[in-house]
Amino acid sequence: LAELVGRSEHIVRATALEARSDWTLIGGRRRIVTDTRIRVEETLGGRPTAESEIEVRVLGGIVGDIGERVDGQAELVLGEPSVLFLMPITPLVAYVTGAAQGHYRLLSDAQKSLRLRPSPHLPQLVRPEESAAAVLSGATLEEARALIRGAAK
């Protein structure tokens, strides 16, 4: 967790509002990326974002009848809140730090408490017991706040 926190400029609780996929050049090759506009509802760590809404870019998506899947990428669900660890590309566009390792869905448990769940496409990790996912998965939002702040010290 300390590494993920240290590599992230922004750590936020946010909701995905809309997404669009398009072609872009990455490393001299045409690739499909999906940009999701998120509404930042709370800064959990790092610096606050410059705006209340920013774009989060992940590799892969569908443009026309062509799809490109990139394993291990975060999958933001429209309308669903999540905790995101972000690295800015520009002031208004960011990548998810560590791809799916930096995305946690916020889902209600039986007591209506929001709990962090790993991104749906989290790959198999080396030393998973030491990963941020092992520490954060199942934590309430309150517990996650404390864990993130503790890891930042």
Regions found by a protein language model. Give the residues of each.
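Transition segments tied to proteolytic processing and entry into folded domains
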Residues: 1-153
